């Protein structure tokens, strides 16, 4: 590529190219002037180290809990296990091999690791994204299309989908080990250094490749997740409205029948012939019906709160996906179509923090999908009994967590979810 050759030779006075992320293209600008702020490298190292430790710790705990606890091997958790593995790969094979060359202004790991890290980085990003899409579709099918989804919502089907996801990702990213190579250059102090570069034979191929990645790893997955979680939120919102109408109807019926008798138009009163079993139990227990009513009311309120929490969590998932990945995909597309302008504006500190933002997804995924779920926390306590137990929650919190757990696993049918508050509390 003539344009790249001229940039590497710095013939026009333009700094050598910066690598912008997804493909591990060295991720730094060589021979750049030192940062204007002396504290910037220290802050960069601190933030990278923090994200690295959180990601390794969080995903390792998720993998350990899901593997050692057989009771947690549900369909959704199988996808979460695959997601944790891909996020751990993203952290281990990307962050060190991006941060260290950035600081040293030299890719010191050799040609083999240049090819390997670019390949594993692309694969881990692809697997992570496709896993997020699979989780959203699995939840959508279980909540919004329960009858149709029963056929394929099995562990064996989930394992097949995960295997296909990994194989597809490895196949898609095969250009990286083929076209990633070390490119030597001479610094201003006459020292020789190397850049790990992913360079396709032509500018058109480079543009087509980054456009392809933008579509299959960002735009299309983002749209699918927005639609799936939007439909789930709509389903839950309709359930909330149904609960509210049922509660209102129950209050009206209670007000109209509070005296235990009915009045017709002639002014006569008709006493009920047979009291219900619930009334008999209330009389025998000396007002125990009030406690049953309070439990029912508490469970209904907890169910409502749980549904609202799930809706908020789904919104957070979509927002974080776009927040973490939009900057880096936009930067890669910008560089593919306008290399000079992108490298001038994004070199050095800006691209380093854009990359850091994309790596943040590998540490927030375990928090959103696992540690916010009470069943996973209980599984964690069972796997690591040395950890302190926070103690049993109250009845209202327990009912809400139970409902939220069922919703997060997407195991309820549309009818049962929408009519939860109309049914009696489980015995």
UniProtKB/Swiss-Prot annotation:
Polar residues bias: start-end ranges: 411-421
Claim: Zinc-finger is one of the keywords in the record: no
Keywords annotated in UniProt: Cell membrane, Disulfide bond, G-protein coupled receptor, Glycoprotein, Lipoprotein, Membrane, Palmitate, Receptor, Transducer, Transmembrane, Transmembrane helix
Subcellular location field: Cell membrane
Cysteines engaged in disulfide bonds, as pairs: 18-29, 114-196
Cellular component terms per the entry's GO annotation: plasma membrane
Gene: CCKAR
InterPro entries noted in UniProt: Cholcskin_rcpt (IPR009126), Cholcy_rcpt_A (IPR000596), CholecystokininA_recpt_N (IPR015276), CholecystokininA_recpt_N_sf (IPR036472), GPCR_Rhodpsn (IPR000276), GPCR_Rhodpsn_7TM (IPR017452)
Family matches, as Pfam families: 7tm_1 (PF00001), CholecysA-Rec_N (PF09193)
Lipidation (S-palmitoyl cysteine): 386
Ranges of the Cytoplasmic topological domain: 68-77, 138-157, 235-312, 373-427
Organism: Oryctolagus cuniculus
Gene3D superfamilies: Cholecystokinin A receptor, N-terminal domain, Rhodopsin 7-helix transmembrane proteins
Transmembrane segments: 42-67, 78-104, 116-137, 158-178, 211-234, 313-333, 349-372
Parts of the chain on the Extracellular side: 1-41, 105-115, 179-210, 334-348
Annotated stretches, region: Disordered: 391-427
Gene Ontology molecular function: cholecystokinin receptor activity; neuropeptide receptor activity
Topology of this chain in the membrane: Multi-pass membrane protein
Homology family: Belongs to the G-protein coupled receptor 1 family.
Function: Receptor for cholecystokinin. Mediates pancreatic growth and enzyme secretion, smooth muscle contraction of the gall bladder and stomach. Has a 1000-fold higher affinity for CCK rather than for gastrin. It modulates feeding and dopamine-induced behavior in the central and peripheral nervous system. This receptor mediates its action by association with G proteins that activate a phosphatidylinositol-calcium second messenger system.
Name by which UniProt lists this protein: Cholecystokinin receptor type A
Taxonomic placement: Eukaryota, Metazoa, Chordata, Craniata, Vertebrata
Keyword Transit peptide attributed: no
Sugar-modified residues: 10, 24, 190
């Amino acid at each position: 590529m003539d344009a790249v050759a001229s940039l590497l030779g710095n013939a026009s006075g333009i700094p050598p190219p910066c690598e912008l992320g997804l493909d591990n293209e060295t991720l730094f600008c060589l021979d750049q002037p030192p940062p204007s702020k002396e504290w910037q490298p220290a802050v960069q190292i601190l933030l990278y180290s923090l994200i690295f430790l959180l990601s390794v710790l969080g995903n390792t705990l998720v993998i350990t809990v899901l593997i050692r606890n057989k009771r947690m091997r549900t369909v959704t958790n199988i996808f979460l296990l695959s997601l944790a593995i891909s996020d751990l790969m993203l952290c281990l094979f990307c962050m060190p091999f991006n941060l260290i060359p950035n600081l040293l202004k030299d890719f010191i790991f050799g040609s083999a690791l240049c090819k390997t890290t670019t390949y594993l980085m692309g694969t881990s990003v692809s697997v992570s994204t496709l896993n997020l899409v699979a989780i959203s579709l699995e939840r959508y099918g279980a909540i919004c299309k329960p009858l149709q989804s029963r056929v394929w919502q099995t562990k064996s089907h989930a394992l097949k989908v995960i295997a296909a996801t990994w194989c597809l990702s490895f196949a898609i990213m095969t250009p990286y080990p083929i076209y990633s190579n070390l490119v030597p250059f001479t610094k201003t102090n006459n020292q020789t250094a190397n850049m790990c570069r992913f360079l396709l034979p032509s500018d058109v191929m480079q543009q087509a490749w980054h456009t392809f990645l933008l579509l299959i790893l960002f735009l299309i997955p983002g749209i699918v997740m927005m639609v799936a979680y939007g439909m789930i939120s709509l389903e839950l919102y309709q359930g909330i409205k149904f609960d509210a109408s049922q509660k209102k109807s129950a209050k009206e019926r209670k007000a109209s029948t509070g005296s235990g008798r009915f009045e017709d138009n002639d002014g006569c009163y008709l006493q009920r012939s047979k009291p219900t079993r619930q009334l008999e139990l209330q009389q025998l227990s000396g007002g125990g019906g009030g406690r049953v009513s309070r439990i029912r009311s508490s469970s209904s309120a907890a169910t409502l709160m749980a549904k609202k929490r799930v809706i908020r969590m789904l919104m957070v998932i979509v927002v974080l996906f776009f927040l973490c990945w939009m900057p880096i995909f936009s930067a890669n597309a910008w560089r593919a179509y306008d290399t000079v302008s992108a490298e001038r504006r994004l070199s050095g500190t800006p691209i380093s923090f854009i990359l850091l933002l994309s790596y943040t997804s590998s540490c927030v995924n375990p928090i959103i999908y696992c540690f916010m779920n009470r069943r996973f926390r209980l599984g964690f306590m069972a796997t690591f009994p040395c950890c302190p137990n926070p103690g049993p929650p109250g009845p209202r919190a327990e009912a809400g967590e139970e409902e939220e757990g069922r919703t997060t696993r997407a195991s309820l049918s549309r009818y049962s979810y929408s009519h939860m508050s109309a049914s009696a509390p489980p015995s």
